[in-house]
UniProtKB/Swiss-Prot annotation:
UniProt xrefs under NCBIfam families: PRK05422.1 (NF003843), smpB (TIGR00086)
Predominant location: cytoplasm
Cell compartment(s), UniProt: Cytoplasm
A GO cellular component annotation in the UniProt record: cytosol
Species assigned in the record: Shewanella woodyi (strain ATCC 51908 / MS32)
Listed SUPFAM superfamilies: Small protein B (SmpB) (SSF74982)
PROSITE patterns: SSRP
HAMAP family: SmpB
General function of this protein: Required for rescue of stalled ribosomes mediated by trans-translation. Binds to transfer-messenger RNA (tmRNA), required for stable association of tmRNA with ribosomes. tmRNA and SmpB together mimic tRNA shape, replacing the anticodon stem-loop with SmpB. tmRNA is encoded by the ssrA gene; the 2 termini fold to resemble tRNA(Ala) and it encodes a 'tag peptide', a short internal open reading frame. During trans-translation Ala-aminoacylated tmRNA acts like a tRNA, entering the A-site of stalled ribosomes, displacing the stalled mRNA.
Full protein name: SsrA-binding protein
Transmembrane spans: none
Highest taxon in the source lineage: Bacteria
C-alpha cells in the first residue's frame, strides 16, 4: 500500500481572526507571537469561529501582558456550571525578556501594543500575533489610501494593456 502524504499544506484555515482595523490605524515596527491562556469553553468557541479582535488591545499590568477587549462569544451548548464572560482579559504567554522590552517601549516611547491576528499553531495551540507600533495620523492614513488606490489603478491599466 502506498503511504499518504503526512505533510499538510499551510492554508488559510489555520487563521482564526484578523484585526483589519489595526493595520489601518497603526504603523507597526515589530511583530511578535504570543500564546494565550484560555479556558475550555473559550477554545470550543474559537474552534467555531466566534472571535472578534476588532476593538481589542494589549495592556501591561504588574509585569504581565493581558489581552483586553477581545470578544469570544460562548456557545449555546456551554455548560451551566461555568460562568462564561466573553469580554474577560486573557493573559498573554510571553518570555520575561519580551515582556520587559514591551514594558520599556510602552512606558518610555509611547508605543501601543495591538493584536493583529489569531491563529492555530500545529492544530492545537492558539497563538496571537501582536504588533508594537505607533498610531497613524490622519494624513498618513490618506497617503496609504492613495497608494492603495494607485496600485489598483496601475494593475487595471496593465491588465488592459496586456489584453489589447
Amino acid at each position: 500500500m502506498a503511504k499518504k502524504n503526512a505533510k499538510k499544506s499551510k492554508n488559510s484555515s489555520a487563521s482564526i481572526a484578523r484585526n483589519k482595523r489595526a493595520t489601518f490605524d497603526y504603523k507597526f515596527e515589530e511583530k511578535m507571537e504570543a500564546g494565550l491562556s484560555l479556558m475550555g469553553w473559550e477554545v470550543k468557541s474559537i474552534r467555531m469561529g466566534k472571535v472578534n479582535l476588532s476593538e481589542s488591545y494589549v495592556f501591561m499590568r504588574e509585569g504581565e501582558a493581558f489581552l483586553f477587549g477581545c470578544t469570544i462569544a460562548p456557545l449555546n451548548t456551554a455548560s451551566t456550571h461555568v460562568v462564561c464572560d466573553p469580554m474577560r482579559s486573557r493573559k498573554l504567554l510571553l518570555k520575561r525578556k519580551e515582556l520587559d522590552k514591551l514594558q520599556g517601549l510602552v512606558d518610555r516611547k509611547g508605543y501601543s501594543i495591538v493584536p493583529i491576528s489569531m491563529y492555530w499553531q500545529k492544530g492545537a495551540w492558539v497563538k496571537i500575533e501582536i504588533g508594537l507600533g505607533k498610531g497613524k495620523k490622519e494624513h498618513d492614513k490618506r497617503d496609504d489610501t492613495k497608494d492603495r488606490e494607485w496600485q489598483i489603478e496601475k494593475a487595471r491599466t496593465m491588465k488592459k494593456a496586456v489584453q489589447q
